[in-house]
């Protein structure tokens, strides 16, 4: 009921305010003062887990520093800040509300059946499902607050809540690995929180305002705000798992599947790219924008390469998420109208398709006992409906004419128009590598094997509802691509940039939408009532007639086995991570040295 209420409320708010920009001024009100209390409560929660339960005192020090800084700023700036436009609801905000509300609610519905089976399977894990759902809904609530906040002080409050919620969800099983990875997520995001607090203090003391829209306006007016932008970007990098901060998102795989789906699709990482996209008009022609461009581009390329060598389904999805988030950040760093359009469209398509894929992998893991892609042989026989859901999700991520590929087409155009050949090379080669891991995955699940029994009986109605709804959403969002662009994204960009134009010709978008419709209709209609010609598969020996076995040299019957090549000697995870981390760290340090050293003025 709670999930349904959240989804319905999200739809109601979206349809009520779509096309309009609504601004609320809270001022120095009781609600504004309440944000300070929430900051303190969040800090107390961090202190409890870091000092009392697990004795990670240095992490508590990070929280103490930023809390002390924010409280000091609240005290010294009292009565001096301009509190205009504390809450802003525009089309981009509404898109994020729909992503968090609808997709988050579907993940909650899926979790009911999944977590029940999870607890039966893992009897050594303490049953804390009530706590799990409490944190899940708190997470969604914090996302709503974060995306409507234009006042950086309010956004900071919700930002910290999401950091603590992710920490609690990742550590749900309370195993040593889960606890270690949850603390990794916490300290990395607290590091970003410290950068957020520093940005608020610098802006508040310098310009007597903490409004995000005011910051963008100052940048467009040529005011020296590059330090503030760089600090907020660093904060966004940690939350959106850019290299070298991607370790926390990879570590989050130890959590139950609904947590992974939530972190990757509708909350946590989307909070990071939301902030960076909001800053998009202020970037592009300064060193903060340059930092975002290259950190995002490098992350996109190396994360995509690292995914090639992985056979763990969740890890492939994690690297794919990091890669696509890198592309979003890279587009935002360019700062142009076309790049902003591309970034928002990728956010939409990625959220729907990736949530579907995570839930599909989690379901397969529960039914098959493994999430290794090499164990997905014959999934088409054993779990045909789940296999179809996976195919739709994978197609949505990299095949034409689905939305992600069209968005990369737009990204290519934005990079060319902006005159960034290096970024174009990263995009081209990074996109090419996605074919390797998605095609391998498709080949495994569509293979037909002997001795496969149906295993879909254990999937609950709630899980099927979430999976099928997300499958249809992936298709419908691609079909409605032109409408989403015209009525969702372009009005926001018109207000933000002061003009509007088609990034990709509307006629081309309509053609792509019609192609998606035909992809749905033709397979269901083709060949009905017509005689079918069956041709045996070419195997490594004489086909026995069932396409699943062949006769070897000794006339013995050998079952067909398919194995993928993961190219670890070329695209090994450690090699790709170290290269990406080193380049991104160098980029961040160099740009901060230039900005803080005053060599140039951004």
Residue ranges of predicted features:
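Membrane-helix interface motif
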Residues: 15-23, 71-81, 202-212, 397-411, ...
């Amino acid at each position: 009921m709670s999930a349904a209420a959240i989804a319905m409320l999200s739809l109601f708010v979206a349809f009520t305010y779509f096309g309009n920009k609504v601004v609320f001024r809270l001022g120095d009100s009781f609600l504004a003062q309440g944000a300070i209390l929430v900051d303190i409560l969040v800090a107390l929660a961090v202190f409890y887990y870091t000092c009392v339960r697990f004795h990670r005192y240095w992490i508590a020090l990070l929280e103490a520093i930023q809390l002390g800084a924010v409280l000091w700023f609240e005290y010294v700036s009292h009565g001096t800040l301009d509190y205009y436009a504390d809450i802003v609801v525009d089309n981009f905000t509404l898109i994020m509300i729909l992503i968090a509300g609808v997709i988050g609610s579907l993940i909650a519905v899926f979790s009911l059946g999944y977590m029940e089976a999870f607890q039966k399977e893992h009897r050594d894990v303490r049953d804390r499902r009530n706590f799990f759902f409490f944190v899940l809904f708190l997470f969604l609530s914090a996302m709503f607050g974060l995306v409507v906040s234009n006042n950086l002080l309010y956004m900071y409050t919700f930002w910290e809540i999401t950091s603590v919620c992710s920490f609690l969800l990742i550590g749900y099983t309370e195993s040593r690995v889960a606890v270690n990875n949850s603390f990794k997520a916490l300290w990395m995001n607290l590091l970003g929180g410290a950068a957020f607090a520093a940005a608020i203090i610098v802006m508040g003391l310098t310009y007597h305002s903490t409004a995000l829209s005011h910051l963008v306006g100052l940048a467009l007016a040529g005011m020296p705000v590059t330090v503030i932008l760089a600090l907020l970007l660093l904060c966004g990098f940690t939350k959106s798992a850019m290299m070298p901060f991607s370790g926390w998102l990879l570590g989050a795989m130890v959590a139950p599947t609904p947590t992974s789906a939530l972190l990757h699709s509708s909350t946590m990482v989307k909070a990071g790219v939301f902030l960076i996209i909001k800053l998009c008009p202020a970037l592009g022609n300064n060193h903060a924008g340059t930092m975002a461009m290259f950190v995002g581009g490098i992350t996109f390329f190396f994360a995509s390469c690292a995914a090639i060598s992985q056979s763990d389904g969740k890890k492939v999805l994690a690297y794919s998420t990091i890669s696509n988030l890198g592309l979003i950040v890279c587009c935002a760093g360019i700062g142009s109208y076309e790049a902003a359009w591309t970034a928002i469209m990728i956010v939409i398509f990625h959220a729907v398709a990736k949530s579907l894929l995570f839930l599909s992998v989690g379901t397969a893991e529960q039914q098959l006992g493994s999430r290794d892609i090499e164990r997905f042989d014959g999934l088409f026989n054993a779990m045909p409906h789940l296999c179809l859901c996976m195919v739709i999700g994978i197609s949505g991520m990299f095949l034409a004419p689905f939305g992600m590929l069209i968005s990369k087409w737009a990204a290519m155009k934005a990079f060319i128009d902006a005159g960034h050949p290096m970024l174009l090379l990263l995009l081209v080669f990074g996109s090419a590598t996605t074919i390797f891991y998605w095609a391998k995955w498709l080949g495994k699940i569509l293979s037909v094997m002997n001795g496969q029994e149906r295993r879909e009986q254990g999937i609950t109605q709630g899980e099927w509802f979430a999976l099928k709804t997300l499958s249809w959403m992936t298709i419908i969002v691609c079909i409605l691509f032109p409408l989403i662009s015209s009525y969702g994204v372009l009005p926001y960009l018109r207000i933000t940039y002061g003009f509007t134009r088609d990034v990709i010709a509307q006629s081309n978008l309509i053609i792509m939408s019609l192609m998606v419709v035909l992809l749905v209709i033709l397979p269901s209609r083709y060949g009905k009532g017509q005689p079918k010609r069956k041709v045996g598969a070419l195997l490594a020996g004489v086909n026995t007639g069932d396409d699943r076995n062949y006769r070897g040299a000794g006339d013995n019957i050998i079952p067909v086995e398919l194995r993928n090549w993961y190219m670890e000697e070329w695209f090994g995870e450690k090699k790709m991570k170290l290269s990406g981390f080193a380049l991104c760290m160098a980029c961040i340090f160099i740009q901060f040295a230039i900005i803080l050293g005053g060599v140039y003025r951004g």
